[in-house]
Amino acid sequence: MIRLVTMRGRVQGVGFRAFVEFQATGLDLEGWVRNRRDGSVEALFSGPADAVEAMIALCRQGPSAAHVAALADEEAHPDQLRLRRAGERFSGLPTV
């Protein structure tokens, strides 16, 4: 299962990307996370459906300083995994 997830609200400047990277690594997911200039955080998760769904649930909550006002998720294409840094299973990417 591969899902593209976008979180909106107080999700930048609160450790959200580090939270996502830590949790996704713990769930043995592949993918990436990045800030967007519009103030949202975007992440791609790839792995077993139960692990991806658990990660999406964690994103709805976020780290303690965050407030997720909205979360959207959609199917993603495997080609989007190419955005990861070479040799990494899960990458924190630059802001777009």
Swiss-Prot record:
It is an enzyme of class 3 (hydrolase). Its EC number is 3.6.1.7. The active site is at R17, N35. One of its GO terms (molecular function) is acylphosphatase activity. Keywords: Hydrolase. It catalyses: an acyl phosphate + H2O = a carboxylate + phosphate + H(+). Residues 2-94 form the Acylphosphatase-like domain. InterPro entries: Acylphosphatase (IPR020456), Acylphosphatase-like_dom (IPR001792), Acylphosphatase-like_dom_sf (IPR036046), Acylphosphatase_CS (IPR017968). PROSITE patterns: ACYLPHOSPHATASE_2, ACYLPHOSPHATASE_3. Belongs to the acylphosphatase family. This is Acylphosphatase. It comes from Rhodopseudomonas palustris (strain BisA53). The gene is acyP.
